[in-house]
Amino acid sequence: MNSNSTIGRTTLGESDTISLSFSEPSSSLNSRSTDVVFASTSTLVPQQGSLTSLPPVSSTATPTYYSTSLTYDETLHTSIDVSSTSTLVSSTDSSSSSEQDTYSSQYDPATSSYSIITPSMSIFSSTSPMSSSSSITSEWSSLTSTTPTLSSSATSLSSSWSSLSSPSSLLVSSSLSLSLSSSYSDTKLFSFDSRSSIFSPSTPTVISPSYTYLSSISATSFQITTTSELSSSWFSTISSPSTTSNKDTTFPSSSRNTSTSFYSSSLSSTNDFSTISKSSKLSPSASSSTVSISTISVPTSSSVSSSSSKVPSNRPSSSSSSDDTTSAYSSTYTFQSLQSTTSSSIPPTTQTPSTSTISTSPIPTSSQVFNTVAISSSEDSKTIYYFYTQTYDITDSSTTFVTGLPTTIAVAKSEVTSFSAPSSTITADMSFYQHWLDGSLDNNKNQGTSKTNTGTIVGSVVGSVGGILICVLVVWFMLVRKRKAKRHFKENDSFCHEIGRRTGFPTTAQAKEASLQAQDSGSQQRNTETASANNPFSNEFNFKARGNPPPVPPPRNVTAMNGSFQNMRSNFMDQENRFSYGSSFTYSSLGSSTQGGFSTLSSNSIRLGRGLDNDISHDERNTVQNNSQGFLREII
């Protein structure tokens, strides 16, 4: 005994929202102009004869009518927005005692939106001038009429004249009716096609293509009808009294002119816009098809009418003249818009769930041959995808079988015009088939590519770091080299080096050597002093080694001099010869030069000073170290 029971039923509710928005602003520009000119001349020429009869009358009437010039500019903007929203309808979960569960869900279609825009439109209508002329020349009343002309399409014109004459009065009335009618119609057709497909490369039965078709038809018709009516009446009375004398005859006359003008125009337009949308979805697994049709129809009707009337009156007389004009103008504008119902019918579709069954029974050894190959395709803007079943011969050590696996190939549109599936059988091992079942077949193909990408990334990082280090080393080497060159330039460009270079001795380098040798042992100092005895710049920076100037050599010519002159010589030589570059002129040479012996100058060489000459012992040099002065002080 099976008893069915419902576990739960939940109704989530249904929400259906339809929003319809219609906007149609219009702007019109009307320009009207009407000119009516009526000219009438009457000439009375009396003739001899019986006064009881009316004299001949010559009358000419020339009415001129200019029709209304209508300029109509209308801009219409139509915007339609239709949206619908649907939610989950119901959800039912039921089960029975036989361990069978059923779960079903039904959804309404998704939100849809339509937008329709009508472009602006302008209508220009103009009517050519129209004139009418009539001439009456008759004794009793003979009428001649000229039919007016109008340059317009679909135009009807009617004109009527009536005349009545009597011995004492003449009545002429005219009526003019003008009717204009023009129509304008426009039909537009919009068509949009789109196709989409949903497919899965792993399962060939889940290919569900859908087709959507959207077409829009817009029909617009306009009809413009204009009616103009002009009526005018002219009344003239001529009185002729009977007299038998030859006196002057007076003819009093009275005239009345009445004109009536009526103008009426109407404009009607009809706009019908409809949209038809078709959508179909095909599910090969369930062999079912669903078609939904949505229709939107929006007719619009509008009418414009205007009327104008003018009634002038003219009544001149013989004694006085007056002009009474009565005009009336009325304009009516009527606009009516009608919205039609919008119907949309989209039945819900239920997708059949796919079922997958895995059996643990051993694979049979029987072979199957797939002779028929079905090809399906899907395409986008640049690529075409072909789906077919490829035959594989799976071979293993214990079993061999033939199976068909779904295959997808992507081909560019510019490369191929037709495609045929290969009929050959591909041999593969059991691992290939196992990877296909697991869904990891594509991952194995991409392993080699991932390894190559990893090596490329590592190589790029190492190369970048090495290049940065090399650049840093090059910059550091250039900076150090530039700093050394600048320091060397400063040392060689000093003042002392310039003076030493003039005398043939580079003083800068030797001064450094002397300062270093002064810090060594006493034996090294003695060797340095002995080696540099001939170098006047050896003790350049040793200010203590400076001594008093060397003694004055004995005079060559011994002459008798008074004591005052001797004192002057000693004082002079002591003050002038205590520097290293003091003059070695002796008093005898100075005295001889003062006595006129210019050619008897001393032949001795310039003496450098005490402590630097070779003939001075080392002890004497040490005794005069405290009284020495430096070379830089001499320069200052």
Curated annotation (Swiss-Prot):
Bias regions of kind Polar residues — which residues? 1-18, 510-541
- Keyword vocabulary terms for this entry: Glycoprotein, Isopeptide bond, Membrane, Phosphoprotein, Transmembrane, Transmembrane helix, Ubl conjugation, Vacuole
Residues bearing glycans: N4, N257, N492, N557, N562, N626
Q: What Gene Ontology cellular component terms go with this record?
A: vacuolar membrane
Where does the UniProt annotation locate this protein? Answer: Vacuole membrane
Q: Which residues carry this modification: Phosphoserine?
A: S628
Glycyl lysine isopeptide (Lys-Gly) (interchain with G-Cter in ubiquitin) cross-link, renumbered residues? K512
| Membrane-spanning ranges | 457-477
Disordered: region residues: 1-33, 87-109, 238-271, 299-326, 339-362, 510-551
Q: From the record, give the cysteines joined by S-S bonds.
A: none
Iron-sulfur: is it a keyword of this entry? no
According to the UniProt entry, where is the signal peptide? none
The UniProt entry lists membrane topology as:
Single-pass membrane protein
**Which stretches are tagged as biased composition: Low complexity?**
19-33, 87-108
Task: State the similarity comment.
Answer: Belongs to the TDA7 family.
Q: Which protein is depicted?
A: Topoisomerase I damage affected protein 7
Q: Which gene encodes it?
A: TDA7
